[in-house]
């Protein structure tokens, strides 16, 4: 039996895979996500499936959408996956394939599948994956909740126009058929959304600071480029 990977080992593996400094505004985001994913994946009841993959990809891409420099976003994602013993290319493919399955075909059929209705048409073996969630041991996680909701939202947007209504039906119709606490799922989704709002606000502040610094620099350059008045002209004007 392999020993359980420690958090310090996971952190060391991440910083070894990504030795560059992380943008200060996102350092806490990355560290908190790394800790959360570590605790999720070392759980003996953790099960990897496409919904977890979609949740992780959605979480990461949403939180890191405005990261600068942008070319480093994928490098950080790859380092996270490597530290967690996950394959980034497999994660992204599984997430992409799941979304494509949910967006193809009849939205009502896909909705019924997520609700585990007996008459629902199965696609991509998703019914067995969802049924597996009903059989203990199966570890719940915020990442899984985001993955389930993202898959659900791909079909529910055309069925329920209001966000509050979509969330209510998700908790009642999807989570209600799974052994997960609707209250906890709701709280985790709210936390995810509040984190996105907080990052957007921080990003707006940073962008405004950058614009202000740029304007100040332009004023300095404009002042420096003005021609200097000759001394003789200054004496004549003063006389």
Swiss-Prot record:
Keywords: Coiled coil. One of its GO terms (cellular component) is plasma membrane-derived thylakoid photosystem II. The gene is thf1. May be involved in photosynthetic membrane biogenesis. It comes from the Bacteria. InterPro entries: Thf1. Disulfide bonds: none annotated. Residues 183-219 form a coiled coil. Residues 211-239 are annotated as: Disordered. Residues 211-221 have a biased composition (Basic and acidic residues). GO terms for biological process: photosystem II assembly. This is Protein Thf1. It holds the Pfam family ThylakoidFormat. Belongs to the THF1 family.
């Amino acid at each position: 039996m392999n020993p359980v990977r420690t958090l310090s080992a996971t952190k060391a593996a991440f910083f070894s895979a990504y030795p560059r400094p992380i943008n200060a505004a996102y350092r806490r985001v990355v560290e908190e996500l790394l800790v959360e994913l570590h605790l999720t994946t070392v759980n003996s009841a953790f099960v990897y499936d496409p919904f977890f993959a979609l949740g992780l990809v959605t979480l990461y891409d949403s939180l890191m959408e405005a990261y600068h420099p942008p070319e480093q976003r994928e490098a950080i994602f790859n380092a996270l996956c490597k530290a967690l013993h996950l394959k980034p290319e497999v994660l992204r493919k599984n997430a992409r394939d799941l979304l494509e399955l949910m967006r193809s075909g009849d939205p009502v059929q896909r909705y019924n599948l997520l609700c585990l209705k007996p008459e629902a048409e199965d696609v991509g073996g998703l019914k067995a994956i969802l049924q597996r969630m009903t059989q203990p041991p199966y570890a719940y996680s915020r990442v899984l909740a985001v993955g389930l909701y993202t898959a659900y939202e791909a079909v529910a947007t055309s069925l329920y126009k209001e966000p509050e209504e979509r969330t209510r039906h998700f908790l009642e119709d999807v989570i209600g058929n799974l052994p997960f606490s609707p209250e906890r799922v709701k709280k985790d989704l709210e936390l995810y959304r509040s984190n996105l709002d907080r990052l957007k606000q921080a990003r707006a502040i940073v962008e405004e600071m950058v614009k202000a610094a740029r304007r100040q620099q332009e004023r300095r350059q404009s002042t420096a480029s003005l021609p200097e008045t000759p001394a003789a002209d200054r004496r004549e004007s003063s006389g």
